[in-house]
């Protein structure tokens, strides 16, 4: 019963439950991560709030987080995706964010800046989402996209429909 209560509390507060392990985030790790989020988001033209929302949801800002499925690091890159993006050390904050933001930029081009599809593709893989689009009806993916939208809106500080946007306000 106590474990169930903690799980419910964690879901309510919005911690990154996808990552099951990894040392707690340290303040210096968060500062370093924020630096690279800003750097790579600008470089790849990805909205900073989207990157922050992914990190919050995926790892709760833990640099060495590892999920039950094997995704690693702040942005929870799967090993195959990390290799494809040239990320050799997933616990390396710079490499993980660089690869993760590059992947988000690629997904944004693939899905024409529709953040719902970008989030779904990030979570489930781009192939299935590219084939089925918004008709993809996996309950886990739908729940993930809803949580990402809520986290994104908090990060961006705007009421956004989580659809297409290239607003300079969110490109900070």
Regions from the PLM with identified roles:
Residues 1-5:
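Positively charged n-region of N-terminal signal peptides that target proteins for export
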Residues 6-16:
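Bacterial N-terminal signal peptides
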Residues 20-172:
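Catalytic glycan-binding domains that act on GlcNAc-containing polysaccharides
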């Amino acid at each position: 019963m106590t474990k169930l209560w903690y799980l419910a509390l964690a879901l309510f507060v919005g911690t990154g439950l996808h990552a099951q392990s990894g040392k707690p985030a340290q303040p210096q790790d968060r500062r370093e991560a924020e630096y690279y989020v800003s750097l790579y988001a600008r470089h790849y033209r990805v909205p900073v709030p989207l990157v922050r929302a992914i990190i919050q949801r995926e790892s709760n800002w833990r640099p060495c987080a590892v999920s039950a499925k094997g995704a690693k690091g702040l942005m929870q890159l799967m090993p195959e995706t990390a290799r494809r993006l040239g990320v050799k050390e997933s616990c390396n904050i710079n490499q993980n964010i660089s690869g993760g933001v590059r992947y988000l930029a690629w997904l944004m081009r693939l899905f024409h800046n529709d953040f719902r599809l970008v989030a779904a593709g990030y979570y489930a893989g781009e192939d299935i989402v590219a084939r089925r689009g918004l008709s993809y009806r996996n309950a886990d993916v739908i729940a993930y996209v809803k949580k990402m939208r809520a986290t994104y809106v908090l990060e961006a500080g705007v009421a956004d429909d989580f659809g297409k946007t290239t607003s300079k306000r969110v490109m900070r």
